[in-house]
Amino acid sequence: CGQRDAVGEAGGAEVGGGPRTLFFPGSSIGNFTPEEALVFLREAHAACQGGALLIGVDLVKPVGILEAAYDDPLGVTAAFNRNLLLHINRLAGTDFAVRDWSHLAVFDAALSRIEMHLQARRDLTVRWAGGERAFAAGERIHTENSCKWTLPDFEALLTQAGVASGVSW
């Protein structure tokens, strides 16, 4: 396998003359609520009329698998989640102490989504210029959602958005 210059090999071919394919990788659509996903799909479909959508979707799995994926043994996701507090401190001048918060990932079956939370490990107060907020031990801050889909539910969403469902794998 040698290196190739794919752009150079295209020889200045005109881009945009044919049908468009929109690629939305990973399972990023899961970061939208179902209502937001519907709007996105409608807009994406309109943007590539005559073309195609290639979308990564995370499907519903057993709860243990989903929760383990969002609470990995190495603590990568927990560190990512707690890092929000450092950014809030920097941007808003708060005094969140990262060590005072535990990462929690739970699957809400009724909403078909993983919810990530930060949970206060003890009673504490967070301060900022002109204010403060007390948190009781165990109180949570809901930081992120990741919606999961069954194939029939996602196909129904596509239909609702006016998108013809194609191949799934």
Short names for language-model regions:
Residues 26-32, 75:
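Flexible, glycine/proline-enriched loop segments at strand-loop-helix junctions
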Residues 31-43, 48-49:
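A short, conserved alpha-helix within the catalytic core of class I
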Residues 46-62:
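Conserved beta-strand signature within the Rossmann-like core of class I S-adenosyl-L-methionine
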Residues 59, 65-164:
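Substrate-binding/catalytic lobe of Class I Rossmann-like enzymes that use SAM or dcSAM, i.e.
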